[in-house]
A protein has these predicted regions:
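N-terminal acidic, glycine/proline-rich low-complexity segments
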Residues: 1-274
């Protein structure tokens, strides 16, 4: 089960294409637009509705995807689980929003006690706002909610984890991953990835195999103008949750598609990139 929060940066837009193409791998509980220290309403903002073209393109290719696996969620299912979160400023968590309320609804649902991976592709502020609402309105349920939660942050792109989540929820020892290994899959990949990986990220390969004549969803993928891979810095957040047989979800220090993590002694159950 996954909940995605994203600030709509251009590499988030690349990651959302891959996320939708892999949507059969998890139960998607919510896709929420959030903010970060880099992007919020009025500052390098992609727009409150930046997800709409991607969901529309997914609807166009859904029937073809479903031929390969009926587990792909319907476009209507995804649309009903997409909402605008806290986006007014960096670290915004002052008010409840449709996005934070959607997260609250999922976390308080007692009909399903399976773990939920809450991913912050931008700042974790909308997640923080949801948790604050639960603390204020349902304090007796905090322990049960925390037991289901797993956190995966691509960096800490605002201060709400340190200022709210960790101080108020840290006592529950929620498994938490803060990753900086995304750099291998981000803007400076040409300097970081080994040379043998470069051919499938070059423009000729990308144009031939992804960008051109591969349907409306792939056509939205924001590579460089010449077709070169740009960045998917947020993809490790969901790649970690893909069941590859490596059991990295159970033990992140074993390593998986989202990276290999190193356990910290303080706070307990925090994992950082190794």
């Amino acid at each position: 089960r996954v909940i995605v929060t994203s600030d709509g940066e251009i590499d988030d837009e690349c990651s959302i294409v891959r996320f939708l193409l892999y949507a059969n791998e998890w139960d998607i509980e919510a896709i929420v637009t959030s903010s970060s220290q880099y992007h919020w309403q009025g500052h390098k903002w992609a727009g409150d509705d930046w997800l709409e073209p991607y969901l529309a393109a997914y609807a166009q290719v859904y029937l073809n995807l479903a031929k390969h696996d009926p587990a792909f969620p319907t476009p209507e299912f995804l649309k009903a689980r997409t909402a605008l979160g806290n986006v007014k400023s960096e670290g915004d968590m002052k008010e409840e929003t449709a996005g934070s309320q959607l997260i609250v609804k999922v976390l308080l649902d007692e009909s399903d006690d399976r773990p939920i991976w809450l991913q912050a592709w931008g700042g974790p502020n909308t997640i923080a706002r949801a948790l604050k609402s639960i603390e204020e309105k349902h304090p007796e349920k905090m322990a049960a909610v925390a037991k289901k939660m797993r956190l995966f942050f691509i960096w800490e792109q605002d201060d709400t984890y340190q200022k709210y989540i960790r101080p108020r929820w840290g006592k529950f020892n929620i498994p938490t991953i803060i990753s900086d290994q995304f750099v291998a899959f981000a803007y400076h990949w040409e300097k970081i990835l080994p040379n043998q990986s470069h051919p499938v990220l070059r423009g000729d390969w990308m144009n031939r195999n992804i960008l051109k004549d591969h349907g409306p969803l792939c056509s939205l993928y924001k590579a460089h103008d010449d077709g070169r891979f740009r960045s998917e810095g947020d993809s490790p957040a969901f790649m970690h949750a893909i069941p590859t047989g490596l059991r990295s979800v159970e033990s992140p220090d074993w390593g998986g598609w989202g990276g290999r993590l190193l356990a910290q002694t303080e706070p307990a159950r925090l994992q950082v990139s190794s």
